[in-house]
Amino acid sequence: MGIENLVQNDVVLTRLDALFNWGRKNSLWPMIFGTACCAIEFMSAVSSKHDLSRFGAEVMRFSPRQADLMIIAGTISFKQAPILKEIYDQMCEPKWVVSMGACACSGGFYDNYTTLQGIDQIIPVDVYISGCPPRPEAIIDAILAIQDKISNESIKDRHKDYKGLLDA
């Protein structure tokens, strides 16, 4: 007996969406991929003054298999790009990405042949944080934007390969 026999209309799915999204948005497990000064600025966002853990992003993960939010902070070179892509592929689904700082968003002032001009060329980015380096308040705003995005997601949209099973 599969879910297609249990679900006859979208009422159950909307309730499940609300439940899953509430749990996911309030228990983000971030992993920082820090390569430059933005990673140092991220430390102030998790300090006691700003306390990022108030927003559900308390437990920092250092393994991509345990993280669902990747925060890329700093310059990414073309040599690092395959490594970043591999780490992104190792993350569990659903996963979200925050591009933190001018270097991660657009290459910053490193406009040369070795620097990737924005990480969105290799992985999808959900939220961009501008600044060089961005303030801790901007990092908190990005976490709130990710939580807002999670609140509006649906199980049907998240698992496109199982769409036939979820539609009655």
Curated annotation (Swiss-Prot):
<dbReference type="GO" id="GO:0005886">
    <property type="term" value="C:plasma membrane"/>
</dbReference>
<dbReference type="GO" id="GO:0050136">
    <property type="term" value="F:NADH:ubiquinone reductase (non-electrogenic) activity"/>
</dbReference>
<keyword id="KW-0997">Cell inner membrane</keyword>
<dbReference type="GO" id="GO:0045271">
    <property type="term" value="C:respiratory chain complex I"/>
</dbReference>
<dbReference type="InterPro" id="IPR006138">
    <property type="entry name" value="NADH_UQ_OxRdtase_20Kd_su"/>
</dbReference>
<keyword id="KW-0813">Transport</keyword>
<feature type="binding site">
    <location>
        <position position="103"/>
    </location>
    <ligand>
        <name>[4Fe-4S] cluster</name>
    </ligand>
</feature>
<keyword id="KW-0472">Membrane</keyword>
<feature type="binding site">
    <location>
        <position position="38"/>
    </location>
    <ligand>
        <name>[4Fe-4S] cluster</name>
    </ligand>
</feature>
<dbReference type="Pfam" id="PF01058">
    <property type="entry name" value="Oxidored_q6"/>
</dbReference>
<dbReference type="GO" id="GO:0009060">
    <property type="term" value="P:aerobic respiration"/>
</dbReference>
<keyword id="KW-0411">Iron-sulfur</keyword>
<dbReference type="GO" id="GO:0008137">
    <property type="term" value="F:NADH dehydrogenase (ubiquinone) activity"/>
</dbReference>
<keyword id="KW-0479">Metal-binding</keyword>
<keyword id="KW-1278">Translocase</keyword>
<dbReference type="GO" id="GO:0015990">
    <property type="term" value="P:electron transport coupled proton transport"/>
</dbReference>
<keyword id="KW-0830">Ubiquinone</keyword>
<keyword id="KW-0408">Iron</keyword>
<keyword id="KW-0004">4Fe-4S</keyword>
<feature type="binding site">
    <location>
        <position position="132"/>
    </location>
    <ligand>
        <name>[4Fe-4S] cluster</name>
    </ligand>
</feature>
<feature type="binding site">
    <location>
        <position position="37"/>
    </location>
    <ligand>
        <name>[4Fe-4S] cluster</name>
    </ligand>
</feature>
<dbReference type="GO" id="GO:0051539">
    <property type="term" value="F:4 iron, 4 sulfur cluster binding"/>
</dbReference>
<comment type="function">
    <text>NDH-1 shuttles electrons from NADH, via FMN and iron-sulfur (Fe-S) centers, to quinones in the respiratory chain. The immediate electron acceptor for the enzyme in this species is believed to be ubiquinone. Couples the redox reaction to proton translocation (for every two electrons transferred, four hydrogen ions are translocated across the cytoplasmic membrane), and thus conserves the redox energy in a proton gradient.</text>
</comment>
<keyword id="KW-1003">Cell membrane</keyword>
<keyword id="KW-0520">NAD</keyword>
<dbReference type="GO" id="GO:0005506">
    <property type="term" value="F:iron ion binding"/>
</dbReference>
<comment type="subunit">
    <text>NDH-1 is composed of 14 different subunits. Subunits NuoB, C, D, E, F, and G constitute the peripheral sector of the complex.</text>
</comment>
<keyword id="KW-0874">Quinone</keyword>
<protein>
    <recommendedName>
        <fullName>NADH-quinone oxidoreductase subunit B</fullName>
        <ecNumber>7.1.1.-</ecNumber>
    </recommendedName>
</protein>
<dbReference type="InterPro" id="IPR006137">
    <property type="entry name" value="NADH_UbQ_OxRdtase-like_20kDa"/>
</dbReference>
<dbReference type="GO" id="GO:0048038">
    <property type="term" value="F:quinone binding"/>
</dbReference>
<comment type="similarity">
    <text>Belongs to the complex I 20 kDa subunit family.</text>
</comment>
